[in-house]
């Protein structure tokens, strides 16, 4: 079960639109701290090097300050750590966004990386849904199981309550496809979480609630 975490070294004084979540199971121990109004500061240590690299993309291109520390049963494989980092990140996003008052809510970006081109569209709708359209040609990038990309986004979507559509428009290199996906996700999320000055203090829904 998640619990509030102590302030991190990266984000010592928690401003509005920031959160810290600590999640412990028999398989993993994960701490995530983030500031949605950050500048891209990042410190991650999950024990899964390729996942660390992708989390850096989220922070850098999403302009969020992000700290992730995780230990898990990676002697078995990376699945539990990968999924639980996604769960905890999703929970931290939901906590930092609160009732989502004043945000754009929707975000969209198409990111190239050499021959790869990936489109991401998302909506902080309060209704979790993932439409996943990557065709990653290899089973692994280094030691990272490429099936875990989808599992990571399933976890983030379900626990942040977002709708997320990922489409691969081009690409043959597995690393490029995955990295373009994380970059596009970061930029789309940056657009969605920005405060719309015209919306002021209202919730971005015709229903009045998300």
Curated annotation (Swiss-Prot):
It is found in: Cytoplasm. GO terms for biological process: L-histidine biosynthetic process. PROSITE patterns: IGP_DEHYDRATASE_1 (PS00954), IGP_DEHYDRATASE_2 (PS00955). Keywords: Amino-acid biosynthesis, Cytoplasm, Histidine biosynthesis, Lyase. It catalyses: D-erythro-1-(imidazol-4-yl)glycerol 3-phosphate = 3-(imidazol-4-yl)-2-oxopropyl phosphate + H2O. Its EC number is 4.2.1.19. Its main location: cytoplasm. The keyword Nucleotide-binding does not apply. Coiled coil: none annotated. GO terms for molecular function: imidazoleglycerol-phosphate dehydratase activity. One of its GO terms (cellular component) is cytoplasm. It is an enzyme of class 4 (lyase). Pathway: Amino-acid biosynthesis; L-histidine biosynthesis; L-histidine from 5-phospho-alpha-D-ribose 1-diphosphate: step 6/9. It holds the Pfam family IGPD. Belongs to the imidazoleglycerol-phosphate dehydratase family. This is Imidazoleglycerol-phosphate dehydratase. It comes from Synechocystis sp. (strain ATCC 27184 / PCC 6803 / Kazusa). The lineage of its organism: Bacteria, Bacillati, Cyanobacteriota, Cyanophyceae, Synechococcales.
């Amino acid at each position: 079960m998640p619990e509030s975490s102590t302030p991190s070294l990266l984000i010592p004084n928690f401003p509005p639109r920031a959160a810290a979540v600590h999640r412990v199971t028999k398989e993993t121990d994960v701490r995530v701290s983030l500031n949605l109004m950050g500048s891209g500061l990042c410190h991650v240590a999950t024990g899964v090097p390729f996942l660390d690299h992708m989390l850096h993309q989220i922070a850098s291109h999403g302009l969020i300050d992000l700290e992730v520390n995780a230990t898990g049963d990676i002697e078995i494989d990376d699945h539990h750590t990968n999924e639980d980092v996604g769960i905890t990140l999703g929970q931290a996003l939901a906590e930092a966004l609160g009732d989502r008052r004043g945000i754009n809510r929707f975000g969209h970006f198409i990111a190239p990386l050499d021959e790869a081109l990936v489109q991401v569209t998302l909506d902080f709708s309060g209704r979790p849904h993932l439409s996943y359209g990557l065709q990653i040609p290899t089973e692994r990038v280094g030691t990272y199981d490429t099936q875990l990309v989808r599992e990571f986004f399933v976890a983030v979507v379900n626990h942040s309550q977002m709708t997320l559509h990922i489409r691969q428009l081009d690409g043959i290199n597995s690393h490029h496809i995955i990295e373009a996906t994380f970059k596009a996700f970061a930029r789309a999320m940056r657009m969605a979480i920005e405060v719309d000055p015209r919306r002021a203090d209202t919730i971005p829904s015709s229903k009045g609630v998300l």
